[in-house]
Regions:
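Nucleotide-sugar-dependent glycosyltransferase donor-binding/catalytic pocket residues
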Residues: 67, 110, 201-202, 233
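C-terminal substrate-binding subdomain of Rossmann-fold SDR/epimerase-dehydratase oxidoreductases
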Residues: 4-5, 27, 63-66, 119, ...
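Short, conserved catalytic or interaction motifs in soluble domains
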Residues: 43, 199, 260
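Residue-level signature of the cytosolic catalytic core of signaling kinases
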Residues: 54, 145, 161, 201-205, ...
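Short alpha-helical
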Residues: 44, 97, 203, 264-265, ...
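Hydrophobic alpha-helix immediately C-terminal to the catalytic Tyr-X-X-X-Lys motif of short-chain
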Residues: 172, 176, 180, 212, ...
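Amphipathic alpha-helical segments in well-structured domains
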Residues: 117, 209-210
């Protein structure tokens, strides 16, 4: 098969492009490429991409990836000459990611990682496109020892537990990606992403930092569903987006961890948020929820070696940017009455 011509810019497909990570990725890709954003808004949000809709190099397609996608037949993509140029790169991020809703959308989560991943891989095969899959540290399960997770660790997972639809879904998707890559000689990359945070995170999906910030801005108790000595790691969104782009540009194919290896006490994160918001909130500890899990640490040696990547944004700086964006969210009751500049 002859290589399709590339006109003035590459055509890039981003599934889950209206989500927290996907929308930030689209912001960067649109600077040099034509971007096709796919989402069905199960956990993505339209306001994440509103600012991109008038850009002539951006096109949003509302579609459930568990259904086949015949991209070349979409009339709205004629301007990208997809029928002639095809798609050069695919970033597959689409997966419902809302810990508080795992028990509400388990089948949707499993199908996105199985049927959905297969459908997008078929597009990659048809277009001979480079393929990047955003996996998760969840495939490792809970740590059995203090050592950071390396890519060659197989994981300790409960296949029928409260988080199984997400954890096992990601594990199956990784297997699908790797086997498609081998069978069809595709260039595939898998990024196992550890905790990340930043502007545009949903305020209601059960993630720790948005929950803490929302509580602090409303003056409510900050509830920590873990022991007082519990720790975790957090990577700011701009560092994560840089890692994703470096991975796609690199010659590296395979699996790589992406995360911040700095281990932080959760209570210290809560106290920092209270300080930055000038909140009167108090910290209370509660019994862990069913969908919560003990977090492991990332070993990012391979990311440093193969991608030349490591996180550079300090937690405090990332929290300030996240809080500034969340203060503008109308869904957070009472924020407009707080004086943050005193």
């Amino acid at each position: 098969m002859a290589v399709k011509p590339i006109f003035e810019k590459e055509n890039i497909l981003v599934t889950g492009g209206a989500g927290f990570i996907g929308s930030h990725l689209c912001d960067e890709l649109i600077k040099k490429s034509k971007v096709i954003c796919i989402d069905n808004f199960i956990t993505g949000q339209e306001d994440n991409i509103d600012h991109l809709l008038k850009n002539p190099d951006f096109e949003f397609v509302r579609h459930d990836i568990t259904e086949p996608l015949e991209i070349e037949k979409l009339s709205e993509l004629r301007k990208f000459k997809v029928k002639f140029q095809g798609i050069q790169k695919i970033y597959h991020l689409a997966c419902p990611t809302a810990p508080r809703e795992y028990n509400k959308i388990p089948i949707e989560t499993l199908l996105a990682n199985s049927h959905g991943t297969k459908n997008i891989l078929e597009l990659a095969v048809k277009n001979k496109a480079k393929f990047l899959f955003l996996s998760s540290s969840a495939i490792y399960g809970e740590p059995l020892e203090k050592a950071p997770f390396k890519e060659d660790y197989w994981g300790f997972i409960n296949p029928i537990g409260p988080r199984s639809c997400y954890n096992e879904g990601k594990r199956f998707a990784e297997s699908m990606v790797m086997n498609y890559g081998k069978k069809y000689n595709l260039e595939v990359k898998i990024l196992r992403v550890f905790n990340s945070f930043g502007p545009r995170m949903r305020l209601d999906d059960g993630r720790m930092i948005p929950d803490f910030i929302t509580a602090a801005l409303e003056g409510r108790d900050i509830e920590i569903y873990s022991p007082q000595e519990a720790t975790s790691t957090f990577c700011y969104i701009s560092d994560l987006i840089e890692a994703i782009q470096r991975a796609m540009r690199s010659n590296f194919s395979g699996v790589v961890n992406i995360g911040n290896p700095e281990e932080l006490k959760i209570i210290n994160i809560a106290n920092e948020i209270i300080k930055l918001t000038q909140s009167a909130s108090k910290i209370v500890f509660k019994k862990p929820l069913p969908f919560t899990a003990k977090q492991g640490l990332p070993d990012i040696s391979l990311a440093k070696e193969k991608l030349g990547w490591f996180p550079v944004i300090p937690l405090g700086e990332g929290l300030k940017k996240t809080i500034d964006q969340m203060k503008g969210k109308s869904r957070v009751v009472g924020i407009e009455n707080i004086n943050f500049n005193k």
